[in-house]
Structures are given as C-alpha cells and as structure tokens.
Amino acid sequence: MRTRFRRSMVRRAAFTGISMVLLQVGAGAEGMYGPFSEYAMSQESEIALAKSAAPGSISTHATIEVLTPRGYEVAVKGDRDFICMVLRGWSAAPDPVDTRSAKIRGPICFDSVGARTVVPAEELKAKLGLAGKSPEEIGHQVALQYGLGKLPKIEGAAFAYMWSASQRIGPDAGAWHPHMMVYVPYYENRFLGNNPVGNHTAPFAVGEGTPYCIVMIAVDDRLAIRAGER
C-alpha cells in the first residue's frame, strides 16, 4: 500500500509539474483521452471538490474554475487572487498510462502567482485533451508554447494547496497526504538533503533543476478536507 501511494503521489506531482512534460515529451504509450462525458461532474460537486483543496479562509474567497466541454471556465468569481480547480488526467501528460484514467480528480488551489503562471498551462492541457489530442501531443504543445513565450514563466515561487481528502490520484488509488506544492524554478533536491521522492516526513523536489521544479511538502493528515466539509 505504501509503495502504491508513493508511486501515485509521484504521478500526481506531474499534474502541475510542467517539468515532467519537458522531461518526457515523446516518451511512452499511445492513446487518446475519453470524451468530455467521462470527465464531467455536476457543477455543484465540482465546486465543492475544488474548494476542498484549501482551508475555508482561502477557498471561500477564491475563483473556482470547472471543466466544461470547451475547457475550464469560471463558475464562481472570487474576491481574492486564488484560483481553485479540479485537475484531470491530462494534467500529467505525457506520463504513464495509468494517469490517463478518467477517474482521476486532483483538487488544487493556486496562489496569485500560480494563478497567473501555472493555471494557463492547465487550461491549455484541458482544451487539448478535450480536442482529442494524445498525451504526447499535449506534452509537445505545452512545451512548444512555453518555448515560444506564449505561456507565462513562473515568477519566483508559486504556491498551491492540495489538502483534499476526496482526491483520486489514480484509477486504483485514493488520496495522498495533504500537502503544499511550491513551484521553484531550477531548485534541486540536494538543497533539501536529497530526501526520497514520495517521502511524507520531509520535503522533496520533483522535476529538479528545471524551470518548473516543484517542492512537495506534506502537512499534518488532520488538516485533510473532505469535499463539502468546513
């Protein structure tokens, strides 16, 4: 069980780790994502799940984006700069085949920097996935758009909450520990002491040394939030 969650956590890190896209473009299996109907949720359920990613002091003031047949669209306009949304499997493109399950749900809330610099990439990946692009095509297009300067670069450090206890990080896995994701360009795991990837007792870096490195910091399991609970 511990090994399965460690592997699933690493896959989930790639949901918003553009570094994983750049490292794996051209790799892996073939196949398209399913139609929108396989990823759809009721708006009420998706809003509740998105909000479960962060404490109420943040999520109640955040803008909430939900998935539609056209991609992510604003369902609730917040009064702060946070954006909360529920990521789907294409956020990990072009990662391993099991991240392509339509069952995957990754609630996440981005701070103002992440809202400006990470969310646009997630919105693009959703549109490409819904347009029938393969995981490899999505990875290529995202990398290309970054290279052309059409997607914004991460400014300094961006923070994201992933505290939901209702997340689903793989077809046969549930939630990992609630944690923070810190987007720190060019950071390296050795700066943290080379902690093992998937370790919930110490921070570790995913996509280290790239412009899109993420430091994962697990928090107390008692902070996990179930959708609809506050």
Where do the language-model regions lie?
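N-terminal secretory signal peptides that target proteins for export/translocation
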Residues: M1-R11
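An N-terminal RHG(E/S)-centered segment typical of histidine phosphatases
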Residues: A27
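Bacterial N-terminal signal peptides
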Residues: A13-Q24
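Primary mode marks residue(s) on the alpha4-beta5-alpha5 output face of response regulator receiver
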Residues: E30-R230
